[in-house]
């Protein structure tokens, strides 16, 4: 292992569970790069300005940002990438000699795993469960890269769905966003792509259920669909299992995890992450856990 000269890290609240240190430190070791990635837990949003000033003062090379700080950090970096501006959120910060660039690699995290299915998605309806930041990243990836005939948001609170749509339409009035209640079964069944952009199904997280769809709603899934669950732990969520049983193409959340990490890694190091090797190692790690 080479001598460590640069620090990378993750800022968030109660994020000791994160697999990001494993991914980035494994990649750095494989490529013999002098980077070490660690976790910085921040208890309160009011500490973000001090944290980023500390990043400048200490020469921390780069940071990932996770919930609940992806929006607030946009106010304290020096520049925002086009992607970060599009979704109003930063998940990656690059320190360029004290000048902090805020970027968003979540959009690439959604887009990259869908590349093999581009023709299937073009001018076909796509659906997203959720109305938060992850859903917004999914909307932007679909709008920018895949041009579906409709982007349907399936939400429990239509007002929140409308707020997200208004945010997108402020910059892209042509975006084909449609708002549906969570029980709009015909609209769900008609989607060629369904993305779970909620934390439902995450190991150890208390939510209203453990799947984006209830067991009795499995009949809505079929072999003409692509099912993408952003949740990566557990590897096989109830939603993924339902989709596999229905014969759908399944994209597990680990693919988004790796894709967004690879994009961040390249921004910090200028190097290409060995994603196939990383995928093999993280799948082994996720499979081995109790």
From Swiss-Prot:
InterPro entries: Aminoacid_DH-like_N_sf, NAD(P)-bd_dom_sf, SDH_C, Shikimate_DH-bd_N, Shikimate_DH_fam
Reactions the enzyme catalyzes: shikimate + NADP(+) = 3-dehydroshikimate + NADPH + H(+)
Chain positions recorded as shikimate binding sites: 18-20, 66, 91, 106, 232
One BP annotation, GO: chorismate biosynthetic process
Positions bound to NADP(+): 130-134, 230, 253
Family membership noted in the UniProt record: Belongs to the shikimate dehydrogenase family.
Role: Involved in the biosynthesis of the chorismate, which leads to the biosynthesis of aromatic amino acids. Catalyzes the reversible NADPH linked reduction of 3-dehydroshikimate (DHSA) to yield shikimate (SA).
Name of the featured protein: Shikimate dehydrogenase (NADP(+))
Gene of this entry: aroE
């Amino acid at each position: 292992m080479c001598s460590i000269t640069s620090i990378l890290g993750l800022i968030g609240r109660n994020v000791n569970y994160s697999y990001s240190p494993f991914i980035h430190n494994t990649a750095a070791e494989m490529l013999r790069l002098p980077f070490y990635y660690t976790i910085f837990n921040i208890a309160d949003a009011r500490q973000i300005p001090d944290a980023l000033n500390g990043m400048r003062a200490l020469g921390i090379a780069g940071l990932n940002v996770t919930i609940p700080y992806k929006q607030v950090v946009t106010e304290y970096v020096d520049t925002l990438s086009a992607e970060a501006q599009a979704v109003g959120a930063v998940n990656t910060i690059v320190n360029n000699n004290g000048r902090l660039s805020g970027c968003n690699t979540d959009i690439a995290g959604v887009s990259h795993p869908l590349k093999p299915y581009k023709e299937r998605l073009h001018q076909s309806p796509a659906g997203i469960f959720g109305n938060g930041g992850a859903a917004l990243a999914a909307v932007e990836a679909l709008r920018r890269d895949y041009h579906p005939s409709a982007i349907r948001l399936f939400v429990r609170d239509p007002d929140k769905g409308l707020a997200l749509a208004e945010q997108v339409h402020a910059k892209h009035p042509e975006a084909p966003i449609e708002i549906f209640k969570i029980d709009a079964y015909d609209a769900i069944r008609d989607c060629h792509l369904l993305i779970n952009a909620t934390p439902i199904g995450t190991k150890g997280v208390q939510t209203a259920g453990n799947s984006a769809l209830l067991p009795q709603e499995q009949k809505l899934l079929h072999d003409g669909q692509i099912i993408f669950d952003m949740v990566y732990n557990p590897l096989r969520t109830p939603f993924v299992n339902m989709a596999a049983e229905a014969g759908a193409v399944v994209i597990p959340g680990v693919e988004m995890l790796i894709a967004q990490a690879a994009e961040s890694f390249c921004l910090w190091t200028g190097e290409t992450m060995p994603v196939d090797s990383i995928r093999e190692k993280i799948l082994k790690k996720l499979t081995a856990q109790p």
